[in-house]
Structure formats: structure tokens, C-alpha cells
Amino acid sequence: MKKIIYYYQTLIDLEEFIKNNRATHIILSSIHFGFNNNELYIHLNDSPIDSDIFNKVWKQLKVLNDNGLTIMVMMGGAGLAYNVFFDNYEKAYKLLTDFITNHEYIKGIDLD
């Protein structure tokens, strides 16, 4: 079976994609880890994952998953992202697994 994977980093409206989808997978990019007031946090591109700017993204990805697509996230490796992750592994791993668990339609992770 052929797989068509759509890498989704520029957060555009997915409504047209929902209507006319030919993909089998969507990989949302990119998850990173950083610090705010010395507190480790997880962010998608430049914003915390719980930011209101992602409300529509989460809803649309759930619809796509309900329509049979496999939804994954990519953890970005650019800009020394893995250094923060591995230097703070226990906290970062918990943030990552909590994020995936709380978004039940996310089925896996692509390690860039």
C-alpha cells in the first residue's frame, strides 16, 4: 500500500485538506523544548503547545484522524533542540509523553 505523507509546519487552515484529502499520514512539525523563567516547557514552532493559536489545528487534526489519517508529530533537531531534550531528559520526556497522551489522535513521533 502506498503512503502519502503530508508534513505540516506552516499552520494553514486544513479545511480544504479535510474535504479533498489524498494523504495517509500528517506529520505536524516541529516540537521543541525551551525554558521560560527557568521552567522547561514544550512548544510547537515558536509557541507553547497550549497556546490558543493551535485550537483550530488540534480540532482539524482530530477530524482528519477520525477520517482515517494517521497523525504524528516531529521533534525538530535544528538549533540544538536535542541538547535541551537530553540535558533535561526526565522532565522533557514527561512533557512529550503527556502531550501525546493528551492528544489521543497523535499516534507517533518522527525524530528529525
Give the positions of each predicted feature.
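Chitinase-like catalytic core of GlcNAc-active glycosidases
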Residues: 1-112
